[in-house]
Structure formats: C-alpha cells, structure tokens
Amino acid sequence: MAAPAQAVVKEKPPIHVYPQAKIGTKIFTHHGIHSMRYNGVCALTGSTVLMASGRFVMFVDVHKGTIESMQGPENGGVGAVAVHPSRQYYVVCERKPSDPAIRAYSWPSRTEVGEFVKGATKGFSACAFNKDGSMMATVGMYPDFFLTVWDWESRGMVLRSKCHNTDVYTVLFSPFDSGLLVSGGAGHIKFWTMANTFTGLKLQGLLGKFGRLEISNVSGFVVLSDGKVISGSESGLIILWEGDLIRCCFAREVDREDDDGTAATFMARSYDYTPCHEGAINVVELMEGGRVLMTAGDDGYFRFWRVSELEVAEGEGAPPLYVPECLGEILVHAGAFIRSVTYCKDVDEWVVLDSAGVLWRVPYVHPDDILNNAVTKPKEQAVPALEFNGGSITSAALSPIDHTVVTGGEDGTIRLVDYVTPRELYKMCLPQPNVVIGLRFFQKDPEKKKFLACCKSGAVLLVKRGSTAFTLLGQWRPHNDGLALFAVDAAEHRLCTIAHGTVFFFTILDDFSSLEPIGFCKIPLPGATCVAWDDASSCCLIGFECGKLLAIRAPTRDMVDQSVSYEFTCNYALVGIRQRKKVEKKQANVSAGEREGFVEEEEEEEYLGPWPVRLICPMADGDFAIGAGGVELLYKYGLHVRYEGQKELPPLPPTGIEPPDYVEEPLMNLCYRDYTPEASSMSYSGRYLVVICEGSQMLLRQLDEMGRVRLEPILVASAHDRLDGPIAAACTSFDDKMLVSVGSDGLVVAQLLDGCIAPQPPSPVAQLQPLRAEEIVEPQLAPFSITEQKDLDDRRRAEDEKRRELNLFLDKLKDVHQKYARLLRENQSLALTHRLSKEEITIHPQIYRELQEEMRQRVEESRKPTALELARENIRTRKMRNRFVDNLAHDRFLVRSFSKEFSVASFRTPYVDGSIKLFQQQIDELLGSERCSSLACDGDRGIVSVASGEASQQSPRNLSLSTAAGVVRWLNSEERKRNEGEQQKMNAAHREAEILTTTMRQYLNKMDERREERHWRKKGYEMLLAHKPDPAVEEASLNEELRRETRRRGECILRTDPSYHSAPSAVIKLQQLIRLEEIIFNMRNNFSNELLKLRDEKERLCGTLNVSLQRIRAINEKLKDKSFHADDVKLTPEEMPGKRFEISRDGLVAFMKQRQEEKLREQTAKKAQRGFGADLATGEPATNTDTSGADTPATRRSEGEDSRKVTISANRDSFGTAAARTRSVRTGTLAASKGGRPFSGGGFAAGAARERMNHELRVKHENIKLTEMEEEELQIERNRLLAERQRLHTQVQAMMDEFDVRLWSMYEERSRVDANLCLAHTHSLLLFREYNILLVFRQKDFELQSSYDEARNSRDRCLREMEELQRLVQDQTASIEKLQEANKVFRREVEIFISNSFPAEHVPYITKVFLRQIKRRKHHSDMSGNDDDITSDDDDDDDMGEDEAWEEICPPNCSEERWCEVIEKREVRLDYVDAITEERRQLEATEQRIEEHKALADKNNAAVSTCLKAIEDFQGEKRKQLNMLETLVAMRCGQVRCLDEEGRCPDTFRRNDLVVVSDKVITGLHDRIRALAEEKHDRRGKLKSMVAEQQALQRERSEKQALHTQWEEKIYEAMLLKFGQIVNLEVLESSCGSREVEQLKERLRLEELSWEKELRKRDKKIAVLREKLHESLEYNTSLLQTIGDQESDRQSVERSLAQSTQKVVSKMYDSINVATEEDRSNLRLLIAAQQEEIDALRTEVALLRTKGGHVYAAAMAAGR
C-alpha cells in the first residue's frame, strides 16, 4: 500500500497551465482514397464497393461515381474492412492506441449488429471470412501481429496465435477446407492448420522457405483443392507451394540453352527466364470452382492460367521453373499498378484498385470463355470509374480567392480540388515525375492565381492556375536532388531553398512571372529541419536537428559576382533561445534523510534538451512561433539575442550564472496539453495560427486585430488516421470558415469551424466529353517448328474432345437449371400460403457432401497400407535429425591448406536454446517459490544501499593506482568519506535557512563543486606527476592495457576487490550461467562463420586455380612433359560435410556406376570359377572392353576438347600442324570405336588391324624431318609455352601461399578461441558450484527477507495511520474554530434581540438568564456515566449560586412570547457549548493516539534497522563462502617470475610468492617520457626551420608557375603552327604501331570500366542492406520501448485501482459521515463483485500471454 503514496510524492507538477479547450470544428467533406492498401476494395451489392481510407469507411458506387462514408474511431483509424460471403454484413477493423475492436454492421442499413473485442493491441491489418461465413480470421498490426479466428455467430474468439514478426498484408481461408489458412506479408508466407492436439484445437503454422529464390513480399495467394498454395511474388513469378517448400515456379519463358551449345548436365542450374508479370503480383484468385487462376500485378495486366496444369507441374533448374500455357490476358491500362481486385456479381464487373489512385471497371470474363481462348480481344475495354491522387499527398496550398486547394503528391501530379463539392477540377503531370514537397500562392499577385511548386528533385516551378488547366510559367533547378525546405519573405520578393547543406536565394520579379537566381552558400550546420524569413533583419532563419537556430543574412545581387561563381560566403548568427520554460522545483514534503535523494532522482529523470527545431512561423506582430520536438514546446519569441559568426553559445563565466540577455526566454506558450508540435501555418487573414502536431492532431490559435494570441486554444476534430496517417499540410480558407488538411492517407479533409455558415458549392460548368480513340494492336504470330506445331495440334485436339464432353454435360446441366428456374418462377407466382420456402425447395444438398466424403474415404484407403510404415520412418528420421543435425548451428568441418601441412577445424556448435530454456524454467520456479518478486527486488535494493555504505568505509589499499581513472576513483571515495559529516551539516543548514532564488542556489552549488574539483585535481596531479607529459594519453594506453588484460583474464573485478559488493542469489547465478552459455555459443559461432567464409573462398579459389592448372596441363601435353604435375585442386569430403545429406543427380550417377562395377566384379568372380575359356565362350573380351571404356568417354571427350583447343591455337600461331593432324586422326579413331557395338571376334581383328595402321602412320609422321625454319618456330613456341607455364605456376603458387597465410591466422585464432573456451567452461563450473552453495542459503535468505518485509510493512502502516490522525486533528481544530465563531455570532444576535425586545431595566436580568449555565441530560446517543455535565461560559463572571425559582419568572411588562424565545435561544447556546466541549475531548483523544503511534513507529524503525543489519551480515557470510571457492585465473608466461634456485620453472604454482608483476613497465615508461621530451624539442626546432623553408618554397613556386604559364602559351602556339591542333605527346609516344596491341588495350580498358561499374553497384547494394539493417534495429528498439511503456501503464492502472479501493473502504468507516449497516453491506457486495471481475480479467490476460494462444470461448462467457 506504500506505492500510491510514493507515486503521489514523486508526481511532477505540469510545466504549463492551460484553460480547458473544446473541439471547435466538425467534418464537412473529404475527397480521395488510400490507393496503397492491399485488399482495399470489397464488393457489396449492386455496383457498390467497400473501402477504407484514413479514419473513414467508404461506400463507393462505381457506376454513379458517388462516395458515401462513415467515420471510424475518434482517436485512431480503420485498419481493414471485409464483406461477409452473404453480402448482408460487413466488418470494420479499427486501429487505435488501445483496445481496438472489430465492429459488424448490416447492409444496406449500416446498423451495428455486433462487436469483437480483444483481438489486437493497437489495430488490425487484414481480415477474411471462410466460404460459408461461419468463421472470420483477423491479423493484428504491430506490436503483436496475432492471428485470431473468430466465431461469427457467438462473436467469440476460437483460436489465437502469433502470426509473424513483420507486417501481414493478407489472410485467407481455404475455400475447400476451413481448417486451412494462409497468411502473407512483408518477406514471408505462412501456412496454418487447425490441429486437434491433446490440449484441444490449436493453430499450427509453417513458415514458407524460399530456398534459392529471393525472399519476396507476398500479398496474393490461393489454396487449391489438394492443399497446395499458389502465390505471387515481387519478381513476377507465380510460385506453387507444397507444404512449406517451393515445388515449382511458373514463368512465361525459360532459356534452357547452354552457353557452349551442349546439353545441360545433371546438376541443378539456374536459367534465364521471363516472369509471368513485369513487376510484383498483388492479386491471385480462383475463378468459379477453381478451374482457372487469375493473376494481376504492377504491369497492369490480368492473366489467366489453367489450374489443372499448374497443380501437377514439375519444374527444372534452381529454382525449379516451368512454363505453363497462358489462356489469355487483359490490359487494364499501360500505366496501371493493380493493387486489389473484387468481383461485383450484380453488374458482372471487376472493380480494380490502382495504386495510381484510379478505380477501374473491367468487364468480367466467364471461365468457359477463358478456357476456349476467347479473351484475346475483349469486347469492352476497362473504364476508369473514379480518379484521385495516387499514394500520399505531400503538400497543399489553399486558394486565396475561392474554396479550392492545390495538392501535390508522391505520384508527381499537381491537382486542383474543390473541397466543398468535393471533386477534382483538373490536374497537371510534371515533366519529370517527382514528389512535390511544397506549394505556396502569391498573395501580392493581382489575380491571386500564381503559385510556387518545389519538388524533391531540386526543381522550382512557377505555375499559374487557369480556368481549365495549369500553366507552367517557368522552372529552375537550383539543386541536383534532395530539395526539402523553402520559404518566401512577407513582401514576396525573395525566395530561399535548402537541400543537402546548401541554401539558394532567388529574387521574385514584381509581376511574379519569373525568378532571378542570386547565389548559394553552404550552411555551417547539418540537418536543417525548417526555414522562415525574418523581414526585420533581412535574414533567413533556419532550424536544425541539433536544436540550434541560425540567422543567415540574405545576399543582394551586387554581393555575388555571378561571372565567377554563384557561391558566396555565408554570413550567419546564432540565435540564442531557451527551448523550454524554466520551472521552479518545489521541495517535496519528505523526511530530511530522503530529501536529497529525491531531488537527485528528479534531476536525473528530467531531460533538459536540446530538442530538434520543428517549425518557425512568423507572426503579425513581428514575433515568431518556434516549436521543438518535445511535448508542449511551442513558444512565442522575439529573437533579439544573436551571436554573430558563432555556432555555439559562449561559455558561462566562472560563477556559473548566466549574464543578462544570454539567451531569450519564451514569451508565451502556444501549444496545448500533451501535444507535440510538428508544423504550423498562418491563415491569409492573420486571424488563425494552425498548429499540426504528432499523431495527426491539430489545434487553432486565434489572434486579435493587434496580433495578440488569445489564451483559449481551439481543438480540431480528428480527420486522419492517428496511428498511420501523418498530416502533410493544413490551413484555413480565404474567409476563415473552413479548415482543410491533407495527409499520407491520400485524403483532403475539409472541416467547418463552429459558428460559421457552410459555403455553397459552385455552379457546374458544362464540359465537353473527351474523345477516346481505340488503340489498334498489331497481331504477332509466334513461330513454331513442325514438331512443336504437331504437339500443339495433338494437345488442342485432346482438349477439344474433353471440352466437347464437358459441353454435353453442361448442356444437360443447363436444362436442369432451366427446369429448376422454371420451378422457382412457378413457386414465386403462387400465393403466399402455398409458396415453398427456400429451405424446402433446395435440391438435394446431401449429394455434394456424399461425394466429398467418398473422395476423402478413397484417399484415406489408398494411404492405409503404407501409412504406418511411413509414419514410423518419418518420426524416426525426424528424431534423428532433431537429435544430431537440426540442433546444430554449425557442424564440424575442416579447411585444409593447399600445402597439406596443416588444417583448421571448426567447432561443433549446438544451439543453446534448450539449455537456456531449462535455466529459465529453474529461474521461474525459484521466483515462484519466493511468492513475490517485487519484495525480493526491494530487498536487493536495500542490500545494495547497505553494501555501498560499507564499501565507502573500507580502505582502498587494493585499488589500482597505476591509471588516472583509478586515482580519480580513489580520490572520490576519500573525499566522500571525509566530507560526509560536513555535507550532512550543510544540508541541515540549507533546510533551516531561507529559500534562496534559483540563480543564487545554482551559483552556490557550482562554487562548491568547483572548489571540490580543484581540491582533488591538485592531489591527482601530484600523484600523476610521474605519468607526464600527457596524462590523458597515458590513461588511454593504460585503459587499453586493462581491456586487453580483461579479455585475457576474463573477469575485470576480482572477488577480493573492495569495490566488489553484491547480493548473490541463485537466480542471479542462473542468469549469469545463461549469459555465459550465450557467450560460449557466440565464440564458437563467430569463429565457425569466419572459417565458413574462408572455406567458401577456397571453393571459389579452386575454380580459379583449376582454370590455370588446366592450361598448364594443356601446355604439358603440347610439350609432352609429364614431370611437371598440375593436378586439379578440390575440396575434400571432410571440408564439405553438409553435402552428405544432399542428393544430387551426379551423386546418383556415381552410385549407379559403383553398383554396376560391383555387380560386374561379382559376375567376373563367378565366371572365373567355371574354368579356363569361360570368358571366351561368353564374350568376356567385349565385356572387358566395355568396362574399360566405361571410364573413357569423359576422358576421350576432354581429350577431344583439348585437341580442338590445341588445333585452334596452332592455327593462330602457325605451330603444331602435324601434331594437330596426328591428334585429330587419333581422336577420330577413338570416336569411331566409341560408338560401336561390343566387339565380336572379327570385329576385334579389324580393330587390331586399324590400330596397327594408326601406329605405322604415327611413326611415319614422327620420322618426317623438319626444316630449319620449322625447327626454329617449334623452339620459339616451346620457349613461349615454358614461360607461360612458369608464369601460371608462379601465379598459382602465390595464390595458394596467400590462402595458406590467412588459414594460418585462423589456426592461431582457433588456439586463442580454444583457450577462451577452456576458461569459459571453467568459469561455468565455478558458477554452478556457487549456485549449489546459494541454494543452501536460499531458505534463510527468504526468512530474513520475510521478517524485513513484515517489519517494513508494520512501519509503513503505522506511518499511514499517523498521517490520517494528523489530518483528523486538523479537521477537528477547524471544526472547533467554526463552532466557536458560530457561537459568538449567535450570542451577538441574541443580545441585539434582547435589547430590542425588552425594556432597558430588564435587559441585564434577561441577559443573565440567557447566559446562565444549567444542568442538562445529554443526548440519548451518549451513554457515558457523567449525566450532569455542566460547562461555564468564558464571559459569565457573576455568581450563579442563587435560587433558580425566580429566574424562570418572566419580568413584568415583558412579553411572554419573547421570554420563551429567550429560553429557547439559551438551549441553542447550550447546544453550541456542548458541541465545542465534545470536539475538544475528541481532539485530546486523537493527540494521545498520535503519541502512541510515534512510540510504535520508533519501535518499528528499530526493527527494520535490525532486519537490515541481519540481511547485511548474512550477505557478507554468503560472499565469504563464495570467496572460499578456488578461481582459475589465466596468466601469461611472462608474468611467471619466481623460479627455483637452479633457474627452472617450479613444479607447482600453488605458492604465494610465485606470481609477481614485472617492473620493466615502469622503467620503460620513464624512458618513454624522456624520449618524448627530446622528440618534442627536436620537432619544435624542425617546425621553425620548415616554416622558413615553406615560405621560400612558396615564393619559388610562384615564380615557377609564372614561367610554366609562359611555356604553356609557347607550346600552344607551336602546336597550332605545326599540327593545327592540340596533340597529346605522351599518348603519342606511348602508342605502338601494332593494331592488335591497341585493340587488346582498348578491350582491357573497357573490361576494367565494366568491373568498376559492377563494384559500384555492389557497394550501393551493400549500403542499402546496411541501411535496412539499421532501420530494423531501430524498429525493434522502438518495439521494446513500447512494451515497456505498456507495462508501466498496466502497473499505474493497478496502483490507481488499489488506491480507489482504499478510498472506498476509508469512506465506509469514516467517523464524520457514518454509513448505515445496509450501505456497508451493499458496498461490501460491490467490492467483492469487482474483485471477482478483476481476478477473471487477470486470468484472461495471463492466458493470452501463453505461447500457444489458445482461448476457450465458453470459459470466457462463463467468467462474464
């Protein structure tokens, strides 16, 4: 119960106080659609489709061209919409910051019929129904991405599971089985099944694996009848999925021809292909029964495919490609980007959502026509129904003369929109499509129709608005790209644009017909965010991301010499402003011992900037509105404090007090509570300031005639999506009646201000219908060969036969349908009493179910014989893989060196998820047994505070004083210990003294801090004197040495270190074990990854080397030299262990050959047993010949290829003609023998004769005597080949040696990793021993913690009771004062009454009677024993002891009625007296109880201190036991100094005097200091001499340059006289006379240029990938922060609930307002019911947090 009180104490007061604001606008019209949504259109009835844009649900009639809308949630938007299959309902999925819902509506009444709750955290991104509409699936957006299945009838949640960790675009039920679902989105596709498990029905998902195919976004897919899935991709391929793997990819064309024209090998290879669509495929749908597949994408085409062909296709290559037959295609438009498609049955049309902002109507094509190839020329073309802006609207400018707005968007168009009607009047497409970032009308223009348009490409356009179109007056390009900001001064004479750190200035002509450039300068600071003009100082104000504000003086035309350059020197000044208003910190009402800690904590939590400057808006009175990127940081400034030529504020004086006018303080806050400003604009009339804030929020600030801002802001109604629809621009209309805003959701929203009359729409202007010409498409004939044509004819003939049979069946079916329709019409014509219902007239729906059941049974029967064995094998294989393969991040593999002298092995690295999960379970069990983790955290915090106090009292003798950081730490601890008492006294004096001003307090604090800094800095300099000349360099070097020592030793802080004080527990040790396991895994994994990269590099290197080695072998063959070995290099099986699980075609062929050889050896062995001649009888020689030839074809082929290559080179070089002829003859002989049959006896003799003839021919060729010229040519060629072989051998050897050197470095790294792993395993063993020890102490630790918690709770309860009693004392004192004051007033009134009602002589007597005290019996409610309570009045001093009888007699000549009134008033006075007495008695009793509670609080404080001391002692005992364990510390051999007497290393290292630190380091440091001093002196002398030499060289350089200029002029004249042109003599001298050499050089240059281009492309790709990685990291970080914020919100809600419960209980038993027994019983029942509801909600939340995501709808309903 202490948490709420603590939260109240630490609650910060608000920075600004605002008056209560109300919404002062209402939605009037909106125009546009969100064209970038997937599944953005859904068909309703008729020609109406359902769409969602921003926070509006739209009903679009594509025939009439009208749009009706319904607003979504106020503080969010619409995430997705879907239509029920019955088309009688539709659902709207909300998107809100918290608790989004799914609302179901009926159509066409649009009334809400139901609600689905708790399906997502912030909103939904996709929604779909199953075929019969009984179930609905939704997918949440970030941060949860939950897939939820709902029951439509009960509105309950059926199943739930985490879908993916990225955006999900589409979710889909299978039309054939509602238990199958598919979801797809950013970079993934996932397949879901509703599986029955032993815990019930659950969702099980498989993530699709793209394999070799590039990962793609998937937005369109369908499920086939056999469970396969067909999806689209970004590359334009259609993908067929089976399970979670890709079975086939469909393309329009595949190039299967090899580069060299030979047939492809058995290895899977990649082919070039033409995709099915040019661009992404966004739509994939099945048409009527699943016979035809329709796809559509960004190329604007509909294409149709036969499903029966796709589902059985088998691809070839990697990825597997297949070319299906395209049944037809429909072109929507050449520039269309199809995003979504829906089919309107009532009008028989497709409605297409185009990303360019167009809704198209496409005539529907029947599947029969598609199968009959009748869609080559559609009868009707696609018609645009509605046209809007494509994508986001990035800028807008309102017309100063009428109710229109000019918008610019991402699609590169400028549009004029009438927001009253609303409708688009006309548009202009820019010459170069680009993003329009800003628009502005010229108010000084007489016609007020000219405006500026700035584009992101760097172009500035001057445009004029006409009656029917825009006119481009001119365009300028001051920047190459990246134009982001622009501003026009108030007089509209100057323009400045900003892009990429430069600002360009223009002059605007008086007639606004052109711009004249002045010049540009570079901005001194990066990251410009906003810009505005300061007309008073002729400066351009620029805000930056760093929070600074610069004023750049605008140049004039005379200041820039444009004949030389447009660049001029930037003249700037820093504007000094305080971004947030100063707030005086109030002292919290806490105890004296806790006040200092509270103030320090508040100062740490408070962020003091700087914030990025987001907006600068000039105001009418000359001031500026400046907004920063923080909450409520929008102020009004004068901007008078400036620092010329400065980028930083000047430093403060030594006193720390800001001088006057150091920075400008804010004049007025212009924001509102919890709003963060983003942009602003001023209305044309100057009456309104429009402020755009984060989260699509807006507010208006109204100004009076003098330009002063009124205090009451006006809030603007929500017009755009609060979560995903930022506002790009907003402003009021020319008459200040309307507020128009545009945003990234593509909407133009107009709102009417309260109290204003809506403007009338303009009168329509008749326009001519544009003429459209039909495009003539030239037919193209596809060339076919005779075989292809024959196959095509056969296939068509078979298809025609099938189609004929199908048509016969369809004709019969048509007759049945006609008869059925006739029966329906007859039934409809009957009377209502005789008419059959729809259920009664249904024709045998059981037939379909029986057929489905029969098919299912057949499939099950076919699977039964092998089902058991197959399941066993699958389970066995899965278990083995899970146990030995799948649990490994890296398997062990070797990388051998080329020299074969050494090899490096990787680490067999298993995943650590299992062990970490086991440790986490143990942690959960330990935390669960402690019953309250928060208590443990509080205890740990208390223990840490005690331990820190103990650490401050210990001696720092063990601290390292060898570094500056160690000395600083020691000095700080010494100063804290010495000044602890003085600081307490100073704090007490400060608390008792008067409250100083903020400036004086800061000054005194800074003086104390600086005095303390000077003190310990002086001592530090004395100790660090030996570390001269530069302590910072020495500290850095020593810190680096410490880091190296830490990495080598493993643990920086030893347990014997005095700064090591912890509260060890079993949970902490388990967490340390988890971190250690992750470290070990990372070490293994990182090394294995590096070695894997090296292995892959070796594999690539082998391919490169084999090319050179193959050339060497060819040279050896030419030279006939077999002594020079050049065998191919390849990876061994040990280096590629992963291939043992791969099954390739080459491996199967090799296995088949091996099996054939084994069978052949067995047959040979059997024949050998039959005796001599058995082989001759069965043709054994032929068999042997074939056997030997089995290995020769490849060899022969390679020899043939080599021979052909040699022949070509010989012809080129005129060498080896005879040898080539000889090889060709031999090759032809072998080729002839290769194709023959197995030899018979005659064939064998003929072969022998041919061999003899070949041998004789060979001998004759060899005996031919060559001429001297031929011998010389042969010798030259031999020398050339030897040189080439030597060069190639040297190159190969160098590449091998370089690889071996890198592999050797990996070998050394492996040794280091081995050592680190040994230390890590030893450390893990130490942590496990510590964990076992801490388990023993765990019970006692828990008991001490429990006793501490009890004592602390008692103390807190006592303090709370004391606070309540003190408040009660204050209330009672105030009540007594009120009663006394009322008594005095009443007495004065009675005295006046007596003096006016009785004679003067009787007034004293009657007054005495009135003031007399009499004995009265107390009220019956007072049951005390003292009934005669007599009180005396303070003003009555007379004797009251006379007889009472005469007092009751009315005096003579007095009215009896007045006398009775006096008696009654006396009773009233006595009642006052009794009440005051009773209150005083209660006050005394309360004060007595306070004294008792104070004594009890002292006892509780003593008990808490005793518990803390016991916990501290117990923690010390635990640390002592842990320190008794032996710790392994890794040392270097150079650190072992102690040897025995003989100079040998001792036998054991367990000696105290064995390990010492070397003192050579200190000697080396002294030597280094002296060397540096000498070097410094020498370098100063050298610097002086070099300066003098530089000056002399500069003078000489000037002279040489003048002489060089003269010679250049002479050479120029000489070349003109001699050659007539300028000739490059160096190129002329370097060129040779050979044309072939020049051609080769040119080819080499072109090749190098292509390589450079490829390298630049790769570098750009790497940069893009790095950017994506950085964005993913930021995105995940934001998700973690969001989770933390939500957890904080949940805790605050629980605290508020507990506090409200306490208030209700306190009110129930309040002593002032006592409730009746019935009220108390009712409150008890209410509290009990609320507690039950809270418990049920907590149970539900805990259930939703479970991993499985299973929810029982029945249990939830019962809980409600």
Swiss-Prot record:
It comes from the Eukaryota. The keyword Cytoplasm applies. It holds the Pfam family WD40. Residues 1155-1224, 1420-1444 are annotated as: Disordered. Flagellar protein involved in flagellum axoneme organization and function. Belongs to the CFAP44 family. This is Cilia- and flagella-associated protein 44. It comes from Trypanosoma brucei brucei (strain 927/4 GUTat10.1).
